[in-house]
């Protein structure tokens, strides 16, 4: 099984395994494994496999390690893996390179692809190849596709893989769509997968097929996945980024699990593939049994068709077949993928910034709306109060109108009676004097009212003047200065009056003395 395994199991597991596998004859697994497994595991293997397996040449474009003749392990291998062949970013010594020639595969080999950007089989990277009749392709966190053809047991766990693998598998949160068939024929590369297989079982693309066997399906806990049976194989699907297999002209039962079909898929076939491969083979073996294609949340990409006819003869199969496959299309490089991711990240940051700006504006608007709502609520309360006051005022006015009507009703007969008696009444002298007195009293009353109003105004003005003055008012400062001048002038006036009185007294004293001296002088001269 594959997935996030943190313990040691008998069979190797693909995907973040931190345990230690102990058996030697087990199936290769792909995924991020941090342990040493029994056989070659594909993916980020940070351990050293302890058990060697069958020796096969490896097909890789870039190898990080030196390979020994054992089972091929594809993927980023950072340990000393005894696997001989694998697809993916391997920057080491590899036997086959890109070729368009015929190649033969040995039995008991497993071609597992993990995080590869090209299409590769056992002997070439673009041409189609035939694999052996025994092998397993468990996938775990694999972006690639693996093709095997014999009965085996594989489990998918958190895999992005797509490919046709002939094994019963239990899927557990597998993000790949694995279609099973009897024999793989054509591998074509998609932007995220080294190869995707298109298998048509009606003699169209089957180089050599073994006797049809019963299909076994074991469904584990799958998410967005559905299991389909094929000859001696089963397929586990679930949330695959590349979608692989097309099967046609056989009794097939296709289950759809929220998949997006590829644009270039054939209308008469049940497709789960993102690539279109046209192959013509002449087979001599028995036809395959009923195959089943399953789809599960396949995010299909544009079909890439690779051109390059090649015929491959399988050595492990009793029948020989000629496969002419055409598959064209460049694979997406890691730099292009990184540039796309960077572009998407920048766009996401711009959208986040724009969203934050809009969120701040929305928050400001929300606060404004809340404040306005509170103001509207208070205004509504005030309006209700005013309405109540208006009702009371209307009632009082109605009461006054009713009183006026009653008064008019009472005065109207009196006015009529006065009009009737006006011709017979003669005014006397006392009546005239009385009227004059009334008019005079009215005038005096009006004058008194005006005087009372004037007194009220004067009192208010005095109260305002006598209150605490505002020192900051320039008019008050001018008033203070004028008051000081007035006080000074009053003091000068008082002082001058006092001085004037003293001068007068002094002048009177001088006059009296002068008169006395004159008298004394007259007496003396006489």
From Swiss-Prot:
Residues modified by glycosylation: 377, 472
Name of the protein described by the UniProt record: Nuclear pore glycoprotein p62
Sequence repeats: 6-7, 46-47, 78-79, 115-116, 143-144
Post-translational modification comment from the UniProt entry: O-glycosylated. The inner channel of the NPC has a different redox environment from the cytoplasm and allows the formation of interchain disulfide bonds between some nucleoporins, the significant increase of these linkages upon oxidative stress reduces the permeability of the NPC.
One GO location term (cellular component): nucleoplasm
Subcellular location: Nucleus, Nuclear pore complex; Cytoplasm, Cytoskeleton, Spindle pole; Nucleus envelope; Cytoplasm, Cytoskeleton, Microtubule organizing center, Centrosome
Annotated Gene3D superfamilies: 1.20.5.170
Function summary: Essential component of the nuclear pore complex. The N-terminal is probably involved in nucleocytoplasmic transport. The C-terminal is involved in protein-protein interaction probably via coiled-coil formation, promotes its association with centrosomes and may function in anchorage of p62 to the pore complex. Plays a role in mitotic cell cycle progression by regulating centrosome segregation, centriole maturation and spindle orientation. It might be involved in protein recruitment to the centrosome after nuclear breakdown.
Effect of residue 479 to S: Loss of reduction of influx rate of NLS cargo upon oxidative stress
Oligomeric form and interacting partners: Component of the p62 complex, a complex at least composed of NUP62, NUP54, and NUP58. Interacts with NUP88. Interacts with NUTF2. Interacts with HIKESHI. Interacts with OSBPL8. Interacts with CAPG. Interacts with SAS6 and TUBG1 at the centrosome. Interacts with MCM3AP.
Keyword Acetylation in record: yes
Family recorded in the similarity comment: Belongs to the nucleoporin NSP1/NUP62 family.
Region (5 X 2 AA repeats of F-G): 6-144
GO BP annotation list: cell migration; cell surface receptor signaling pathway; cellular senescence; centriole assembly; mitotic centrosome separation; mitotic metaphase chromosome alignment; mRNA transport; negative regulation of apoptotic process
Organism: Mus musculus
Keyword Transport: yes
Skewed-composition ranges (Polar residues): 128-137
Residues bearing PTM N-acetylserine: 2
Alphabetical list of InterPro entries matching this protein: NSP1/NUP62, Nucleoporin_NSP1_C
């Amino acid at each position: 099984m594959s997935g996030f395994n943190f313990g040691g199991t008998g069979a190797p597991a693909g995907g973040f395994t931190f345990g230690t596998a102990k058996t030697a004859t087990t199936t290769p697994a792909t995924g991020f494994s941090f342990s040493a497994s029994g056989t070659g595991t594909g993916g980020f293997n940070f351990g050293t496999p302890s058990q060697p397996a069958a020796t096969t040449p490896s097909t890789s474009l870039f190898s990080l390690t030196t390979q020994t003749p054992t089972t091929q392990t594809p993927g980023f291998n950072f340990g000393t893996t005894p696997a001989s062949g694998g697809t993916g970013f391997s920057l080491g010594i590899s036997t086959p390179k890109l070729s368009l020639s015929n190649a033969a595969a040995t039995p008991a080999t497993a071609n597992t692809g993990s995080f590869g950007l090209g299409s590769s089989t056992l002997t070439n990277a673009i041409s189609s190849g035939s694999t052996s009749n025994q092998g397993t392709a468990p996938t775990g966190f694999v972006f690639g596709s693996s093709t095997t053809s014999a009965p085996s047991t594989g489990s998918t766990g958190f895999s992005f893989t797509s490919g046709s693998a002939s094994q019963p598998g239990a899927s557990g949160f597998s993000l790949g769509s694995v279609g099973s068939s009897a024999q793989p024929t054509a591998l074509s590369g998609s932007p995220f997968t080294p190869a995707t297989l298109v298998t048509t079982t009606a003699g169209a693309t089957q180089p050599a097929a073994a006797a049809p066997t019963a299909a076994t399906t074991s469904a584990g806990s799958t998410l967005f996945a559905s299991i389909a049976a094929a000859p001696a194989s089963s397929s586990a699907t679930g949330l695959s980024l590349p979608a692989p297999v097309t099967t046609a002209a056989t009794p097939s039962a296709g289950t759809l699990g929220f998949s997006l079909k590829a644009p270039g898929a054939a209308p008469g076939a049940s497709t789960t593939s993102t690539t279109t491969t046209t192959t013509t083979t002449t087979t001599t073996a028995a036809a395959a049994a009923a195959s089943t294609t399953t789809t599960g949340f396949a995010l299909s990409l544009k079909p890439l068709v690779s051109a390059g006819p090649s015929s491959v003869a399988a050595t492990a199969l009793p029948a020989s077949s000629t496969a002419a496959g055409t598959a064209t299309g460049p694979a997406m490089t890691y730099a292009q993928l990184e540039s796309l991711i960077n572009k998407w990240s920048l766009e996401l940051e711009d959208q986040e910034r724009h969203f934050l700006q809009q969120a701040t504006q929305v928050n400001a608007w929300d606060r404004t709306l809340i404040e306005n709502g509170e103001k509207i609520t208070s205004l509504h309360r005030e309006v209700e109060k005013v309405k109540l006051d208006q009702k009371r005022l209307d009632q009082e006015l109605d009461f006054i109108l009713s009183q006026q009507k009653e008064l008019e009703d009472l005065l109207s007969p009196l006015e009529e009676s006065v009009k009737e008696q006006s011709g017979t009444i003669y005014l006397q002298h006392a009546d005239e004097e009385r009227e004059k007195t009334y008019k005079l009293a009215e005038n005096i009353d009006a004058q008194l009212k005006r005087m009372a109003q004037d007194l009220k105004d004067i009192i208010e003005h005095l109260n305002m003047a006598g209150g605490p003055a505002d020192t900051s008012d320039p008019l008050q400062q001018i008033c203070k200065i004028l008051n000081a001048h007035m006080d000074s002038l009053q003091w000068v006036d008082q002082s001058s009056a006092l001085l004037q009185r003293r001068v007068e007294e002094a002048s009177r004293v001088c006059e009296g003395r002068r008169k006395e001296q004159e008298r004394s002088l007259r007496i003396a001269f006489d």
